[in-house]
Each structure stands twice: as C-alpha cells, then as structure tokens.
Amino acid sequence: MYERVSKKAQVQISPFTKIGYGFYTGHNICMIVNGATVIGNNVNISQFLNIGTNHNTPAIIGDNVYIGPHVSIVENVKIGSNSSIGAGAVVTKDIPDNATAAGVPAQVLNYNNPGRYVGNRYKYNHEKLRQ
C-alpha cells in the first residue's frame, strides 16, 4: 500500500516517521517527510510540504498545528503546539507554542488565535492510550 500511495499521490513518508492521531492532509498533496520526524496529534498539512534533514536530527511538530502550502521545515527544529505556519515559509528555527509564523526564514508574526486552522480535531484520551 505504501508504494501505491507514494507513487500516485507523490507522498514520501518514511515508515519510521512517528505520526500522532488526527493527522490530516488536504488537497492534492505532494510531500516528503524524513524518517526521523515526529508529528504530533491533530496536525493539518497542506500541499507541497518538505521536512528534511541531512544529519538524522528530527524535526518535532507539536499537537494541533496547521502547516500551510509550500512549507519547508529544515533540520533540527521544534514547532510548538497550537501553532500555524504560513504558506511558503522556510522554518529553520524553533517556533514557540501558540504562535503564527511565516516568511523566509520563518518568523513569529503574532500569538493571536493559535491553532484556529486545525479542523476536525481527533479527540483522544491519553489515559486510555497508555493501557
């Protein structure tokens, strides 16, 4: 199945990538995600995402994060929970929780309405998951 999906949808997500509950991809998507990457719960990703590393140092994406189209996330960065990354951003440094960031390189623009673009949130119970 991995092979069929990756060729048809132009999706390359390593089987070693850790992905949380409620992961959502919209539109016609094309993405490349490195195997060291950790993706939290309720992460919404738009088309043409690239998460890469040359040194196997993971990018860590928190919970309830929206990532806009044409975003590149480079190397060892952490994107905080409830954050939004604007279209075309190149993330080279950590983004704090509850932030909206955009630009090349990505910079925090504000802390208003964190995570507002995350729709269809999966409701999970951490205690039940541990059992």
Where are these regions (language model features)?
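C-terminal segments of enzyme domains that contribute to small-molecule binding surfaces
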Residues: 61-73, 104-131
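Charge-rich, low-hydrophobicity low-complexity segments
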Residues: 1-6, 11
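Left-handed beta-helix
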Residues: 9, 14-15, 20-21, 26-35, ...
